[in-house]
Amino acid sequence: MLRLRPYKKCDAETIVSWFKDEETFYKWSAGRLGSYPLLADTLIRHYEEQEYTENFFPMTAFDEDGIAGHLLLRFPTEDKRILRFGFVVVDGTKRGRGYGREMLTLALTYAFTVMKAEKVTIGVFENNLPARHCYYSLGFKETSVTEDYAIAGRLWKCIELEITPEYSVSKTDGYALP
């Protein structure tokens, strides 16, 4: 069974160990944490810079064997009506077990019931098909917002997705990749 708890500094070493190659790292971070390889101290410092705000909530998923995933929840605007998910990752040795979907289902439940978000958004690179399939299966829908990132000498298109409580996975059978 997967559970969600607040991130702890001691999680950083495990989380950064999941990025075995540059492409995986950039699909996760969009370069916001510097270059590959990511060091645990870099992740810790980045999160420490935000820890005294009321809009930044890193979370860690765990199972009976330990840490299994990680994601970030943050309010991008002062009115705190929209919650943004980011830095979503599952331990590569645990992929294929439905942990990504389960972790995001827990996070969506938390977002809508505890944090009272009216909408949750997430960005995903067009070339990250497994993540896109996961998000669509939960009921996320594409918006018209896209952004291009220069990564490793190429342009990567980031697609903005959103979900509201009435379209969450608990109310649908999910959606297929468009």
Model-derived features with residue positions:
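Glycine-rich phosphate-binding loop
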Residues: G98
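C-terminal "cap" of GNAT-fold acetyltransferases
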Residues: L83, E118-T121, F125-R132, S137-L138, ...
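Extreme N-terminal starter segment of soluble prokaryotic enzymes
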Residues: M1-R3
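Short beta-strand(s) of the beta-wing in winged-helix/HTH DNA-binding folds
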Residues: Y26, K141-E142
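Acetyl-CoA-dependent GNAT
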Residues: P6-A12, S17-R95, L104, Y110, ...
